[in-house]
Amino acid sequence: MVVPFKNEPGIDFSVQENVERFQKTLEQVKNELGQTLPIVIDGEHITKDDTFDSINPANTSELIAKVSKATKEDVDKAFESSNKAYKAWRQWSHKDRAELLLRVAAIIRRRKEEISAVMVYEAGKPWDEAVGDAAEGIDFIEYYARSMMELADGKPVLDREGEHNKYFYKSIGTGVTIPPWNFPFAIMAGTTLAPVVAGNTVLLKPAEDTVLTAYKLIEILEEAGLPKGVVNFVPGDPKEIGDYLVDSVHTHFVTFTGSRATGTRIYERSAVVQEGQTFLKRVIAEMGGKDAIVVDENIDTDLAAESIITSAFGFSGQKCSACSRAIVHSSVYDEVLEKAVALTKELTVGNTVDNTFMGPVINKKQFDKIKKYIEIGGKEGKIEIGGEADDSTGYFIKPTIISGLKSSDQVMQEEIFGPVVGFTKFDNFEEAIEIANDTDYGLTGAVITNNRENWIKAVNEFDVGNLYLNRGCTAAVVGYHPFGGFKMSGTDAKTGSPDYLLNFLEQKVVSEMF
């Protein structure tokens, strides 16, 4: 009997003993940096001469790992391995596959601090965010294992005289997982192992910036006894193998989290039926957001300011759920803005090894992109605080608030994916909802209000997949807040939901006559 699902706890760093233990873990992980990571195909670890570097975004002189680059030939071998493994893996019972996932979760739990420390170095994650990422990975795995057990017997359908009918679920085949760098363990583990527990096999192409974090999962899968070939590990240059993975006649599904441009490209290419392809590919895509917090009149302005700042600047704003737009009633606009600026002044920015609130942004490309948007925002509105950027040692950008913006302004329309939030005002709640919906995205949103009528209006009209009342718009919790968005935010395949595994299953009906 499996115990009920329970979320994995974080670590309380207000306890000095926990701080000291994690500092030791950071030192241990630091001593292991700089190794060459292999590709892994059919259980074989293959080190390549052709590599790329994963570096510490907080200290760009520090090498995290050299990463072997998979070629198209390697991808072909990986598909061959996965197709072969699928024949046996799909025959495992739902219960046995779920129990293996629970074993994986138990090993991650034992190594949680190690995995968290890797993310501090490789992704520039603050301590709490890194531990939360590892814990969420455990949550996804535990949740999906139980979901598979619940689906094991299918769903009841009607019988009639002389006829017995069964409705049940079966696996699809081999697929491709392309996870992001911003939740390099949680999303990577969840989007890899959800299809696996459903009986499918996967080629995992990790994000180039966080390959070591993904490789830790490969180590754990091997320790847990996952049969070789069920997950093949193919890090590489997306320009060389990205389209090749998506286009393959062997790819039954693609699960992707990342940019809108890449997501829509995957969606388009997956719609093309290749020669020899006898099925339609499925795409499960999450592509970002332009998330807003709407602040009504007659509210707690401290709550409003704190909700905005926490949601905007946690992990340097590098969350698809991050607040990048504050839409504030004109009667409280000045007060909320003033308090938000005051809170921002208190934030610490620096190398997250030192447990700062904010660390770097992930790489030079993102650094330059965010700098450009700050320059644009300074022309469209007024920079109230922040705006400074320094890449002399790492990719650091100060938390930035831009006021006096219009909904049509570029920084209020386009996803920045950095520590930048724009403020605009409204005079009535209907106008607020119009502004909130005035983007191509629809992922998360929040409303700070004491007016029940306005809240109901937001529930019905604020066009986002995840909507929160009187709190920030980040920090969805597995089992509580299934996560996914509308419009150009993706396919709304809610991760951590009772329905998520259905993306990787086919429904079959068997009618037996007597």
UniProtKB/Swiss-Prot annotation:
Active site as annotated: E286, C320
Enzyme class: oxidoreductase
Annotated S-S bridges: none
UniProt catalytic activity: L-glutamate 5-semialdehyde + NAD(+) + H2O = L-glutamate + NADH + 2 H(+)
Entry keyword Repressor: no
Gene3D superfamilies, per database record: Aldehyde Dehydrogenase, Chain A, domain 1, Aldehyde Dehydrogenase, Chain A, domain 2
EC number: 1.2.1.88
Source taxon at top rank: Bacteria
InterPro entries: Ald_DH/histidinol_DH (IPR016161), Ald_DH_C (IPR016163), Ald_DH_CS_CYS (IPR016160), Ald_DH_CS_GLU (IPR029510), Ald_DH_N (IPR016162), Aldehyde_DH_dom (IPR015590), Proline_metab_enzyme (IPR050485), RocA (IPR005932)
Keywords: NAD, Oxidoreductase
Gene Ontology CC annotation, any one: cytoplasmic side of plasma membrane
Pathway membership: Amino-acid degradation; L-proline degradation into L-glutamate; L-glutamate from L-proline: step 2/2
GO biological process: glutamate biosynthetic process; proline catabolic process to glutamate
Single Gene Ontology MF annotation: 1-pyrroline-5-carboxylate dehydrogenase activity
Similarity field: Belongs to the aldehyde dehydrogenase family. RocA subfamily.
The protein's name in its UniProt record: 1-pyrroline-5-carboxylate dehydrogenase
Organism: Staphylococcus haemolyticus (strain JCSC1435)
